[in-house]
């Protein structure tokens, strides 16, 4: 993608507005209709749109309404809008991050940020980063996880098999599992994946179908993906590519292959899913894929099975219609505590020894909770701060 974008930006034969719409079409083709290009021009970041009888492209009006800024035309003296004289809106570069945070907070848009470098007349432009709901690293406003998930769906005689992987880009945690349905319950794998996405808050999904005969609409509706940002992937990485990718990303030095080193040789759908996911994130921002934790298998055998969408039906997690149990009982003092509370409620263990250990620990600390809470209230989100330090993305004010 970056090479294609740079090739368009280097073409000086076209007007900049025409180049902008070529970029917009390229982004929409790759990421869907909610893609938008924000381009730095002088001291402003601008967004363009054409809306006439012949063509409709761009999101200037939509973004202007969201940010409550004035919509105009490139040349106000010409009433008609076109690619040469588009509808436009812009924000000052000095306040760009504030407005970008507002766009990202919608949990809807995939934003391509094109920046400029150099001084006139030797100004050039480049794709800085692509920010989407699942790859949002710098503008997270809540304390929940921010997972981007990849699913590879296959089927054998109508029985679904799913490779699942997820990355929380804000903490660097990485999860995977492979689930197979049964002849008694052909949708078991889809039910499990639906639970995973509720347990690990998922803002964006890349879904790939290994069998062209799969009813894609049935799967998308079953997993309620239309309520999230999702993309249907076509990239099917070969095993050699997967090994090389994992070796570089996880910095593996071993006589074993990278997949063997990660103990994932028995879950081919999961390794493919993880490779697709990492490749997708690199396409947005290659820096945030650095220093990931090793993939952790979701050991479902430790937990009570929650079928039939139990977490939603019991209002453990929040839905559009009802508040959640988590919200009701959340009196934690730190972001890490809130995430742990959610993990405990959505992953009920069945090991009696572990349950008794937790009870004993709670009883032991109960009389000291007030002074401990006062200290905890002053602790920042260490998991995310540590991740930002590792990636040298920590701001001084943090």
Report residues per predicted region.
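Secondary-structure capping and boundary motifs in well-ordered enzyme cores
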Residues: 333, 354, 371-381
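Short secondary-structure subsegments characteristic of cysteine-rich extracellular domains
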Residues: 391-398
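Basic, polar low-complexity surface loops/patches
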Residues: 1-346, 353-361, 384-387, 391
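Extended, charged coiled-coil helical stalks used as long, distance-spanning scaffolds
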Residues: 360-363, 370, 377, 384, ...
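Proline-centric
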Residues: 349, 366-367
